[in-house]
């Protein structure tokens, strides 16, 4: 047995002291700890062993324990009788209460494992320490038995262990090993509870929030009523708080606004975390971020949850529901449409929170024009609302080719940073007209004089349907935005078609229907508990699919189950791939939230292949930078801005660059969740900025090509 050098020796003595304390405290004789510690040190000193020497503490006579099985046989018989009769003392009394068949099974397992351990290579005797006597394992039991047979174990160890003989010491070691084998048996044979998730009352998913008496203040009213402004004023005066918005763009807008006013505010989105640190190195207690990133585990003074009507959205609504039910804020400000009030009132009755409702009226008049308009009649300050990217770009080309108006575009697939730039150019007059999707309905302060609907039908992902009353009001309300500098401003609404204008007028006169049910889906923590009770260890995709089959019968007056097509599609990539199918459940839960949609891509195969490579990196636990993946088209990124007359060339490049941008954002999203695997985030941010720059250049090229065509058609000199 080797004695460690001084530093390690001190650490060993401290570790042994702590371990012995825990061991003896179970037996009620913790007062012996200091005594065994002092005596062990005295024994070492008395043996005149130099602590800097690596010589053995005990003499090893190198006498083999030839008949070890015969020697321990009587002890094994005594141990078996003790187990059968239930004669074990604390802390092993749990063995006494086991059924006879369990006792027989664990003792047989113990004998088999002991026999195997004695016949296999054991821990070298000169590596055995005092800790091994206190906490034996099958790996070192052979060496321990040999040392005991030669009386080369620590002096006075029997006395301090309340033992009278070597056989008693061996019995103690065997008892500890038997107990360990029993615990392993218990884990392996534990009966699983039937996995279930209770959807009847999702408020109980958040027990910490139920311990609090929270105050909920609703700020409700139409678009352009100042409802969010008032709650942000309250947030800016709080010590700790969070603004939860529906879009990354909106979160950044609040972040920049607060910091420009000297109010420290962090930015927290799925792709990046930007802390605000004061001159003393203290991180701000206020943050602005997306609703998905709201910290449900963290107590705070105030939380602002924007666009509360999204609680009924079948795709993302569960995030709002979980936020309202689970956020640990003393004061919660919910901003949005009045349609959400009745449901929140019902929810508060369940949670026991206090509720206050503040109603706001629109700041400025909104007028529906009597007649429809045309592309040729568009004027400066107009925003043409279109419901597909392809049509948005087509309308941009048509307007620029047939008028002398400069046109900006905003749509969902466009990177948020480019959307913000396009909005700024429209607001400061660089663009005359904006062609945009319903993405303008949330966030983006735009100086729009008139909203022009191209139509009232929208593809919802599976079918084409008419815009809801709520959607029409949300979009139309963007006209005539109020500003603190210029006050209220009248807004106007019209459409390209007479039938659309009639429908819009009806919607604006119709009260918004009340939200009757909220979307729900369990949090990752709840799914971890569910999967822990799954005896089949199924893949997460099959669990979701089986789960959905069972919950089709789910009926509730207050809630409905979230749509899972996108989650299941992502998880099927994992389940159908031999390597990815070995991914642990924790990682599967994380990647099920991957923010990517293959259907909106011009090259879904590229997206899928790259996503699979990202997931393989997670399974293999590789470290990779963004340049280690092959989705970047370096030739396209390095091209100089080219001005031509064929508008399709830059449009096709925009499509490719947007797909590239999606994958860069996904890399950044994964780097936030797997920072040791997806590395060199700085390079990824530089690539992101480069892709955004190239998208902006190609949009300018579209404008130039259209201008060239327009000027030639109308007999003007081409604009430069």
UniProtKB/Swiss-Prot annotation:
Catalysed reactions, semicolon-separated: ATP + H2O = ADP + phosphate + H(+)
Keywords per UniProt: ATP-binding, Helicase, Hydrolase, Mitochondrion, Nucleotide-binding, Transit peptide, Virulence
A GO cellular component entry from the record: mitochondrial degradosome
Residue span(s) of domain Helicase ATP-binding: 208-349
Superkingdom to which the source organism belongs: Eukaryota
Pfam family, one: Helicase_C
Domain Helicase C-terminal: 359-523
Phenotype when the gene is knocked out: Leads to completely attenuated virulence in a mouse keratitis model.
Gene Ontology molecular functions: ATP binding; ATP hydrolysis activity; exoribonuclease II activity; RNA helicase activity
Annotated compartments: Mitochondrion matrix
Entries under InterPro entries matching the protein: DEXQc_SUV3, Helicase_C-like, P-loop_NTPase, RNA-DNA_Helicase, SUV3_C, Suv3_DEXQc
Enzyme class: hydrolase
PANTHER family per UniProt: ATP-DEPENDENT RNA AND DNA HELICASE (PTHR12131), ATP-DEPENDENT RNA HELICASE SUPV3L1, MITOCHONDRIAL-RELATED (PTHR12131:SF1)
Its biological purpose: Required for intron-independent turnover and processing of mitochondrial RNA. It is a key control element in nuclear-mitochondrial interactions. Required for embedded hyphal growth, for wild-type respiratory growth, and biofilm development. Required for chlamydospore formation, distinctive morphological feature of the fungal pathogen C.albicans that can be induced to form in oxygen-limited environments and has been reported in clinical specimens. Plays am important role in virulence.
Protein name stated in the entry: ATP-dependent RNA helicase SUV3, mitochondrial
Biological source species: Candida albicans (strain SC5314 / ATCC MYA-2876)
Lineage summary: Eukaryota, Fungi, Dikarya, Ascomycota, Saccharomycotina
């Amino acid at each position: 047995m080797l004695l460690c050098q001084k530093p390690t020796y001190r650490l060993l003595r401290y570790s042994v002291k702590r371990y012995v304390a825990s061991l003896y405290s179970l037996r009620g004789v913790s007062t012996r700890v200091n005594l065994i510690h002092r005596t062990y040190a005295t024994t070492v000193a008395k043996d005149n062993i130099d602590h800097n020497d690596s010589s053995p503490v005990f003499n090893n006579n190198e006498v083999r324990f030839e008949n070890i099985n015969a020697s321990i046989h009587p002890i094994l018989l005594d141990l078996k009788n003790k187990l059968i009769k239930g004669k074990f003392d604390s802390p092993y009394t749990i063995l006494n209460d086991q059924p006879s068949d369990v006792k027989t099974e664990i003792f047989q397992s113990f004998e088999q494992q002991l026999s195997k351990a004695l016949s296999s290579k054991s821990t070298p005797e000169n590596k055995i320490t005092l800790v091994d006597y206190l906490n034996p394992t099958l790996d070192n039991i052979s060496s321990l038995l040999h040392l005991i047979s030669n009386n080369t174990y620590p002096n006075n160890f029997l006395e301090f262990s309340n033992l009278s003989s070597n056989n008693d010491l061996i019995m103690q070691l065997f008892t500890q090993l038997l107990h360990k084998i029993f615990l392993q048996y218990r884990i392996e044979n534990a009966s699983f509870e039937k996995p279930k998730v209770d959807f009847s009352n999702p408020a109980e998913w958040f027990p910490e929030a139920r311990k609090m008496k929270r105050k909920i203040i609703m700020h409700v009213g139409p678009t352009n009523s100042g409802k969010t402004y008032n709650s942000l004023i309250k947030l800016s005066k709080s010590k700790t708080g969070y603004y939860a918005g529906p879009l990354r763009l909106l979160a950044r807008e609040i972040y920049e606004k607060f910091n420009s006013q000297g109010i420290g505010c962090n930015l927290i989105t799925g792709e990046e975390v930007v802390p605000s640190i004061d001159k003393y190195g203290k991180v701000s207690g206020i943050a602005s971020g997306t609703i998905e990133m709201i910290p449900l585990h963290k107590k705070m003074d105030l939380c602002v949850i924007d666009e509360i009507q999204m609680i009924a959205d079948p795709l993302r609504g569960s995030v709002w529901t979980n936020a309202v039910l689970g956020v640990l804020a003393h004061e919660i400000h919910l901003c949005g449409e009045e349609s959400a009030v009745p449901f929140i009132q019902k929810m508060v009755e369940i949670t026991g929170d206090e509720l206050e409702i503040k109603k706001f009226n629109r700041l400025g008049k909104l007028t529906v024009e009597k007649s429809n308009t045309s592309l040729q009649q568009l004027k400066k300050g107009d925003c043409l609302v279109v419901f597909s990217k392809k049509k948005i770009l087509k309308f941009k080309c048509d307007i620029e080719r047939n008028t002398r108006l400069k046109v900006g575009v905003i749509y969902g697939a466009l990177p948020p940073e480019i959307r913000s730039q396009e909005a700024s150019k429209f607001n400061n007059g660089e663009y005359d007209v904006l062609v945009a999707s319903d993405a303008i309905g949330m966030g983006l302060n735009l100086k729009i004089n008139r909203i022009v609907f191209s139509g009232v039908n929208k593809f919802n992902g599976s079918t084409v349907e008419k815009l809801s009353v709520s959607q029409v009001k949300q979009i139309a309300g963007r006209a005539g935005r109020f500003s603190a500098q210029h006050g209220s401003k009248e807004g106007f609404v019209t459409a390209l078609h007479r039938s659309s204008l009639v429908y819009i007028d009806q919607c604006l006169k119709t009260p918004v229907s009340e939200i009757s049910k909220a979307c729900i889906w369990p949090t990752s923590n709840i799914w971890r508990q569910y999967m822990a009770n799954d005896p089949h260890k199924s893949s997460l995709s099959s669990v979701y699919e089986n789960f959905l089959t069972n919950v089709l019968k789910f009926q509730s007056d207050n809630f409905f189950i979230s749509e899972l097509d996108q989650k299941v599609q992502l998880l099927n990539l994992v389940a159908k791939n031999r390597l990815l199918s070995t991914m642990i459940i924790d990682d599967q839960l994380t990647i099920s939230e991957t923010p990517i949609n293959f259907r909106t891509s011009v090259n879904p195969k590229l997206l899928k292949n790259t996503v699979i490579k990202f997931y393989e990196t997670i399974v293999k636990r590789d470290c990779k930078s963004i340049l280690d993946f092959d989705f970047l088209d370096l030739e396209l990124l390095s091209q100089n801005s080219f001005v031509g007359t064929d508008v399709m060339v830059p449009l096709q490049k925009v499509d490719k660059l947007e797909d590239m941008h999606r994958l860069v954002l996904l890399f950044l999203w994964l780097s936030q969740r797997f920072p040791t695997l997806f590395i060199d985030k700085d390079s990824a941010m530089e690539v992101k900025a480069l892709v955004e720059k190239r998208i902006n250049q190609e949009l300018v090229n579209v404008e130039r090509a259209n201008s060239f065509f327009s000027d030639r058609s109308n007999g003007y000199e081409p604009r430069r």
